[in-house]
């Protein structure tokens, strides 16, 4: 099951949990109000899972691939890890399904504070277009994830600041409406 919390301000190893002391947990409902969607699926049977098939059809996720992030599997590993951890947004939703291993997605809340979302095998997350976020491995240094897209994949990340993009403006409008 996914777990999320507000992060401390430490610049130490990005793979560490970085929990506040005492911990400030973040609920699935709080994530939902940020536009973040979570599902728990059967990663052992992802190739034949009827629930995954239903989700892909309902959400029009017509394209997918599988990426393994590990120093022995990913070309330009160190460079990629640094790139993933740069704060950025996308113009489309980012959908990731963890098939093995674990890692962290960090997202900004409405007050611009970091929330760390711990992802492990079986977790699927959808980050809305326009949300500032980043990704890092945890201390296990390994994740295998399915990347899902509506139509052809668009890989472009826009590093912060990117507030003038329509996707960011739409996301900020969503947050304002959620606050009412």
UniProtKB/Swiss-Prot annotation:
Keywords: Amino-acid biosynthesis, Cell membrane, Cytoplasm, Dioxygenase, Iron, Membrane, Metal-binding, Methionine biosynthesis, Nickel, Nucleus, Oxidoreductase. InterPro entries: ARD, ARD_euk, RmlC-like_jellyroll, RmlC_Cupin_sf. Its cofactor is Fe(2+); Ni(2+). Fe(2+) binds at residues 88, 90, 94, 133. Pathway: Amino-acid biosynthesis; L-methionine biosynthesis via salvage pathway; L-methionine from S-methyl-5-thio-alpha-D-ribose 1-phosphate: step 5/6. It catalyses: 1,2-dihydroxy-5-(methylsulfanyl)pent-1-en-3-one + O2 = 4-methylsulfanyl-2-oxobutanoate + formate + 2 H(+); 1,2-dihydroxy-5-(methylsulfanyl)pent-1-en-3-one + O2 = 3-(methylsulfanyl)propanoate + CO + formate + 2 H(+). It is found in: Cytoplasm; Nucleus; Cell membrane. Binds either 1 Fe or Ni cation per monomer. Iron-binding promotes an acireductone dioxygenase reaction producing 2-keto-4-methylthiobutyrate, while nickel-binding promotes an acireductone dioxygenase reaction producing 3-(methylsulfanyl)propanoate. GO terms for cellular component: cytoplasm; nucleus; plasma membrane. Pfam families: ARD (PF03079). CDD domains: cupin_ARD. Its main location: cytoplasm. Catalyzes 2 different reactions between oxygen and the acireductone 1,2-dihydroxy-3-keto-5-methylthiopentene (DHK-MTPene) depending upon the metal bound in the active site. Fe-containing acireductone dioxygenase (Fe-ARD) produces formate and 2-keto-4-methylthiobutyrate (KMTB), the alpha-ketoacid precursor of methionine in the methionine recycle pathway. Ni-containing acireductone dioxygenase (Ni-ARD) produces methylthiopropionate, carbon monoxide and formate, and does not lie on the methionine recycle pathway. HAMAP family: Salvage_MtnD_euk. Monomer. Interacts with MMP14. This is Acireductone dioxygenase. It comes from Gallus gallus (Chicken). The gene is ADI1.
């Amino acid at each position: 099951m996914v777990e999320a919390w507000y992060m401390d301000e430490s610049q130490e190893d990005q793979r560490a949990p970085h929990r506040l002391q005492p911990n400030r947990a973040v609920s699935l409902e709080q994530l939902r109000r940020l536009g973040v969607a979570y599902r728990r699926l059967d990663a052992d049977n992802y190739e034949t899972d009827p629930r995954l098939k239903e989700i892909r059809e309902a959400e029009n996720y017509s394209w997918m691939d599988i990426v393994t992030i590990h120093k022995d599997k990913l070309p330009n590993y160190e460079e990629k890890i640094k790139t993933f951890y740069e704060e950025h947004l996308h113009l489309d939703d980012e959908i990731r399904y963890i098939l093995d291993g674990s890692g962290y997605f960090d997202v900004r809340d409405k007050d611009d504070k970091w929330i760390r979302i711990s992802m492990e095998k079986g977790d699927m997350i959808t980050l809305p277009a326009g949300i500032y976020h980043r990704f890092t491995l945890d201390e296990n240094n390994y994740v295998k994830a399915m990347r899902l897209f509506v139509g052809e994949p668009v890989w472009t990340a826009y590093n912060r600041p990117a507030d003038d993009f329509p996707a960011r403006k739409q996301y900020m409008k969503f947050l304002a409406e959620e606050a009412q």
